Amino acid sequence: MTQHAPIFIVLLPLTASLLCMLFSRIKKELGPWIVMASIVGAFLSACTVLQRVIANGGKAWHYWMGGWQPPIGIEFALDPLNSVLAVLVTFISMMVALYSKPFVKEEDWLHVGGYYTLFGLLTVGLCGMIVTGDVFNLYVYLEIMSLSGYGLISLGGKKSMLAAFRYLLIGTIGASLYLLGVGYLYALTGTLNMADLAQRVVPFIGTPLFAIAVACFIIGFGIKMALFPLHGWQPDAYTFAHPGAAAFIAGCMSKAPAYALIRFMYYIFKVDSPVMHSALNVLGILGIAGILIGSIMAMAQYDFRRMLAYSSVAQIGYIAIGMAMGNMYGFIGAVLHIINHAFMKCSLFLVIGGVEHRFGEVNLYRLGGLNKKMTISTITVTLAALSMIGLPPTAGFFSKWYLMMGAYTGQQYFYIAVLVVSSLLNAIYFFRIIEQMFVQREASLTEVHPHKGKLGLPFSMALPIFVMGIGILVLGFYSVDIVTDIIKLGLPEVFLR
């Protein structure tokens, strides 16, 4: 069965999602457990793939649907980078699926089944985008990710329907631009397979049609990954999304498009042409603007979730400037920050959801005494905040370190200045949270769901928060191994010459 591990990453959660409503109708609790079991299976399949790819020295595992060879057949192409990202997405999905149970505990079977159906489909879309070797199938998975994301955001109540509708309008533009870019490439090359496309597109790299296609991909993926100034949908979407799913949406939903953009820029188009140099310069400018403006906007917020939404705009800027540097260290920093930020932001949103579940609000200035009421959550927030600032030995330090090395190697010293300023701004608004939790007088919060235990939350919520907090340290301690044994095995050809 291990020879089919690549397809199981997508097939298991897809099958469970399609059956979830039926099982939930039979017994309300059955549907969620079916979806969670399928995600565990997808996670184990992703681990199997990663282990085999590393054992083969980084050689990609090509899986052909039905035995049909590309470019005619549909292919999953798993290399060290997308294999580790598949492990990341399925692991976070597994944690958040368990975490979500108390939020839907009192709902009827229809709402419970609907929630976990959308959750499973979001996992399918994210994993499919990461592992597919076909540009049109990437569009299919992009739409699955987007549609399920719209649904999960709309379940949040209050202003969530408006936030989801705004994301729908803007996201549709992004998906349409991506599809338009695919059409241009197909017109030039006559193929949709990524590996075949990388060979056939070379003679057309200097043409106007190719430049238009590149612009379509940058804008299309830029919208999906909330790259400044294309991030307008994100603050409301993160703020008003269903609290159970917000951690998954914030942690992973912008990372799959970011990786897809890296894949196009470095593996299909290469980066050693005037057109691509111009594209990288644009990414760098947008990344710098996003880092500075996102950080400043985050400082002005009093709602914890909205602050983190603007913080994500800045963090996506880090990934953008890593891509824009055009050297090995910048590339490593960008990929490593995709992994690290997924853990950091997911951890913070898990805690926010826990605070909202227990107290019904997440005002930054009403967190006083939280260290006594929710100890595990407070520790996780502290670790995540230190990592976002970039202090060792947390994960965030190492991705910023590689970005600094990339800027130094490329003599792009203005990137170093931006990273330093951004870290100082991060320190201002994250230490504000730490001060509220540890120093300020205990806030008089009304407990919506009182919890008397030491964990401060139900076990199914406290466990993922604890695991994700530990994960931030583990990623920090093993960052050198991740870079050496995984990321460097999957470096694009341009860095191996």
Say what each PLM segment does.
Residues 2-12, 80-91, 135-148, 210-223, ...:
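Structural signature of hydrophobic alpha-helical transmembrane segments
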Residues 1-7, 19-117, 195-199, 487-496:
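Transmembrane helix-loop-helix hairpins at membrane boundaries of multipass inner-membrane proteins
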Residues 241, 374-377, 432-497:
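Cytoplasmic/organellar membrane-interface segments at the starts of transmembrane helices
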Residues 26, 114-121, 125-212, 223, ...:
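Alpha-helical multi-pass transmembrane bundles of energy-transducing inner-membrane proteins
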Residues 17-27, 95-107, 150-159, 163, ...:
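C-terminal ends of transmembrane helices
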Residues 163, 215-282, 309-310:
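Short helix-boundary/re-entrant hairpin motifs in multi-pass inner-membrane proteins
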Residues 228, 345-351, 410, 414-452:
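Predominantly late transmembrane helices and immediately cytosolic-facing juxtamembrane segments
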Residues 152, 201, 238, 265, ...:
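Interfacial segments of multi-pass membrane proteins
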